[in-house]
Amino acid sequence: MPKVLSPAQVDAFKRDGFVAPIRAISEQRALYYRHKLEAFESRYPNDRIKLDQKAHMICPWIDEMIREPGVLDATEDLIGPDILCWGTSLRAKQADGKTFAGWHQDTAYAEVKPIVVIVALALSPARTENGCIRGIPGSHRGPLLPHKEAFATNSLLSREQFIDADFDQGAAVDFALDTGEIALFNNAIIHSSNANFGNDRRIIFLLEMVPTHAYQHEPRESAVLVRGTDAYGNFDLDPQPKTEMGTAELAAWQRAVEIQSSVLFRGAQRPARALHGMTSGQAPSGA
């Protein structure tokens, strides 16, 4: 039997590619993480960009977040008890009606198979007026559509990508969340988010979860084991951070992000280094 999700919700995820909203942590616990984030932003005003990719490697409190029982129980209901967290990303929007994310499929750039479940954890209200994530039900079972990159926009997306093809946008469903709730969605689903016209920042962390049997052919990437055991060894294991923004933590983070970016930014028209705050060496190949 599922731990958190009902059998109907598990079936809905398979059919529609998402399930939401699910209560994962209390509002008080979410505010704890929000305060940690805001303290980080105050201490490191020029380094928030580092939270856009594999943030669990540089902040102990994010490593704590990805291990929340409510998050992992819901994830286990979808991909089983042996779970790796492959990536963590901050997606925050000011309440200024500007920042958005165009329609896209993460499988346009991510190459991990057979499935990546993205857990969107809300640390503030993420309702329709706040620019919540939106998705096209069932589109994860369809083809990968062609994407283009945009420039000089207010897109949240690292490559400012958008789908350059026709599809039924009228079928979109809002993944509206209250503070402490999660949406779980297949990374192949067509999804986007509008600008935030609410009264508060929209703060979401995206936690990219994969079963331990997941794989990527080349290059070999890293992930962190958050539940169960890893009998496959398809990923190197990320070290858990002991100190926020510590020297060892930043060095490990940079190595891991350079490898991941060599895939995610393959063929990109801007270097991944500039987008993710890396500091030295050459830009990842193809980026």
Regions found by a protein language model. Give the residues of each.
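Active-site region of the double-stranded beta-helix
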Residues: P81, Q105-V112, L121-C132, G138-H140, ...
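Short, solvent-exposed loop/turn segments at secondary-structure junctions
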Residues: S26-E27, R91-K93, A108, A126-T128, ...
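Histidine-centered catalytic micro-motifs
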Residues: F100-A108, N187-S193, L207
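Non-heme Fe(II)/2-oxoglutarate
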Residues: I189-A287
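Double-stranded beta-helix
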Residues: D11, T128-N194
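Short, conserved beta-strand element in jelly-roll/cupin
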Residues: E111-T128, A176-L177, L184, L207-P211
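Non-heme Fe(II)-dependent double-stranded beta-helix
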Residues: M1-V112, K148, G228
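Short, surface-exposed loop/helix-turn segments at secondary-structure junctions
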Residues: H104, R159-Q169, N199-R201, R220-V226
